[in-house]
Amino acid sequence: MGVSDPVADMLTKIRNAARAGHEKVDVPSSKLKVEVVKILKTEGYIRNFRKVEEDGSGCIRVFLKYDDNETSVIHGIERISTPGRRVYSGYKTLRRVYNGYGTLIVSTSLGVTTGRHAREQRVGGELICKVW
């Protein structure tokens, strides 16, 4: 039986690997997952990522980032919109995550972007997840 929410599965793998202190984690690849991981890199939550071909199936290798105290830069990562309960928001009602210390990831008509960028571009969309 397949995974019903692949994005939530990816976020859970990243969260668990960060808490366990792993250097990297591999997740199955998709276009949406690659876009989410790009934002995590741009916002400074991960060191890097690489698309890897293993046995004919695509995989994303995510290299996690830690601070000087060997604690993960990702303190929390939470899925908002799920396959059973989609959550949408207009640009006027996009909230800041943890008073601006976190990042909201939104799927808009302009592509996957951060909540801050969506407000600047005046577009709403589906709330994928929040990271802090």
From Swiss-Prot:
Superkingdom: Bacteria
Matching Pfam families: Ribosomal_S8
GO CC terms of this entry: ribonucleoprotein complex; ribosome
Record key words, sorted: Ribonucleoprotein, Ribosomal protein, RNA-binding, rRNA-binding
Gene Ontology annotations of biological process type: translation
InterPro entries: Ribosomal_uS8, Ribosomal_uS8_sf
GO MF term set: rRNA binding; structural constituent of ribosome
UniProt function note: One of the primary rRNA binding proteins, it binds directly to 16S rRNA central domain where it helps coordinate assembly of the platform of the 30S subunit.
Cross-referenced PANTHER family: 40S RIBOSOMAL PROTEIN S15A (PTHR11758)
Family membership noted in the UniProt record: Belongs to the universal ribosomal protein uS8 family.
Subunit field text: Part of the 30S ribosomal subunit. Contacts proteins S5 and S12.
Protein name, per record: Small ribosomal subunit protein uS8
Organism of this sequence: Treponema pallidum (strain Nichols)
